[in-house]
Amino acid sequence: MNIHTLLSEKIQQALVAAGAPADCEAQVRQSAKAQFGDYQANGVMAIAKQLGLPPRKLAENVVGLLNLDGIARKVDIAGPGFINIFLEPSWLANHLAAALSSPRLGIASVASQTIVVDYSAPNVAKEMHVGHVRSTIIGDASVRTLSFLGHNVIRANHVGDWGTQFGMLIAYLEKVQDGGEAEMQLSSLESFYRAAKQHYDEDPAFAERARGYVVKLQGGDEYCRQMWRKLVDVTMAQNQKTYNRLNVTLTRADVMGESLYNDMLPGIVADLKAKGLAVESEGATVVFLDEFKNKEGEPMGVIIQKKDGAYLYTTTDIACAKYRYETLKADRIIYYIDSRQHQHLMLAWTIVRKAGYVPESVPLEHHMFGMMLGKDGKPFKTRAGGTIKLTELLDEALERARRLVAAKNPSMDAGELARLAQVVGIGAVKYADLSKSRTTDYVFDWDNMLSFEGNTAPYMQYAYTRVASIFKRSGQDEQQLTGDIRLEAEQETQLAVRLLQLEEAIATVARDGTPHVLCAYLYDLAVLFSAFYEHCPILNAENAALRQSRLQLALLTARTLKKGLDLLGIETVERM
């Protein structure tokens, strides 16, 4: 049930009937204050200016033509022409009952599209670090939401599995394999990479062999390919453990590394030349883009092949977009990559559009995000200034959560304590990120994210268990609830309206890739439930009918919180 869409359509029809153009926008919004109703339509002023009418007069005409019988109990006009809509409690109650009887909480599936979502993208032979957190968990929340709405979502883990560094890595893997130390060395990818780099820098013979392996690997040599595949497999097996800990839906089958596009690159360069988009410049192959200017004010030159024949990341990204449209049949392509890569993507996509590889009808969207900062406002690092490994961050989250939970539940058995620490600790790390606008930098703060107060995972998880516990205390099975939902108290009505706004929050996340909108919705819902719980006795209601009604509101709240948190990739438990 999308109230916003319903009201927008109704008000637009009335606007058109009042003389507004067919493409006018009603600008319906959820009201910030109860005195202005449940929804406001703010589009009258702009349309009145177009029509040369006093806004108040147009608003009166629209309200006179507006048919909200059975939907709104009152419609009034405020100020110069704001239309305030107060929803009818009986209408709300009917839709709450429908949501309660629906496995999807009354949310309809949409017309399915094939949507490719590019996220996570770690590098082979390197451990995942905190810099991978935002792409991985924001991208996964987007994927979960789009899938829930009925889209065919293709997860694309654009792993860095190609490049000149692989000659060095293969040469070192060969060296340690000969010494029987391969498994031990590969157990710490970071150490393996550093040792390989040290050998490359200090041993000329090793470096020469490494450079030779680069050429052989790129030429398809089977031995080098076999060694390369081992490096990829070991890395992704370790990454999969991290994804599982994070409750992220990526699997090995979702890996679409840079190497996937290698065979396309010569054809891309030849095609761009044939179309007159790429030219030779100082031995390199370059695309000059009028849409972007360099420091001298001249068209920006984008190198797609160096004079030594090597291809660049841009060439791979052009091929990648082409593949996603032509082979994967994408209707929409979304990239969760940090904001520093924005110009790089814009250059690649401009070439993609000019070459006709992806039509304008297929959106290419960069859902960029800011950096993770420490409390000092600087990029989040170890005290020594090094990069924090993701496994170490998650280990600390679990230990902090274990101490927190143990302090609140001294008698809890070890197994339940470990499970609860996992849910709370991982949930805290994820929710702290997801609850902030992805376009801004955010400060990583253990104390805030593990607090049981405010918009945090522990608060939200506790809110769910609190609602769920009501049923245990009621002694009544969920399936045995009977009777109509009655909305008499103000707190009941406010909770009812918010419950029915879940679809609006989900639709926003699906459109804009902004999970913080869903977090804000769920937090607001939890706060409204607290007010309802405080002012409207549930188990000790005045009569049986009211008790049944309020239990139904509690049940729908629990299901909504659980579904919303699940879409964010946050687990819930029945007891905390």
Swiss-Prot record:
InterPro entries: aa-tRNA-synth_I_CS (IPR001412), Arg-tRNA-ligase (IPR001278), Arg-tRNA-synth_N (IPR005148), Arg-tRNA-synth_N_sf (IPR036695), ArgRS_core (IPR035684), DALR_anticod-bd (IPR008909), Rossmann-like_a/b/a_fold (IPR014729), tRNAsynth_Ia_anticodon-bd (IPR009080). The gene is argS. NCBIfam families: argS. The keyword RNA-binding does not apply. GO terms for biological process: arginyl-tRNA aminoacylation. Monomer. Keywords: Aminoacyl-tRNA synthetase, ATP-binding, Cytoplasm, Ligase, Nucleotide-binding, Protein biosynthesis. Its main location: cytoplasm. Pfam families: Arg_tRNA_synt_N, DALR_1, tRNA-synt_1d. It catalyses: tRNA(Arg) + L-arginine + ATP = L-arginyl-tRNA(Arg) + AMP + diphosphate. Belongs to the class-I aminoacyl-tRNA synthetase family. This is Arginine--tRNA ligase. PROSITE patterns: AA_TRNA_LIGASE_I (PS00178). It comes from Sodalis glossinidius (strain morsitans).
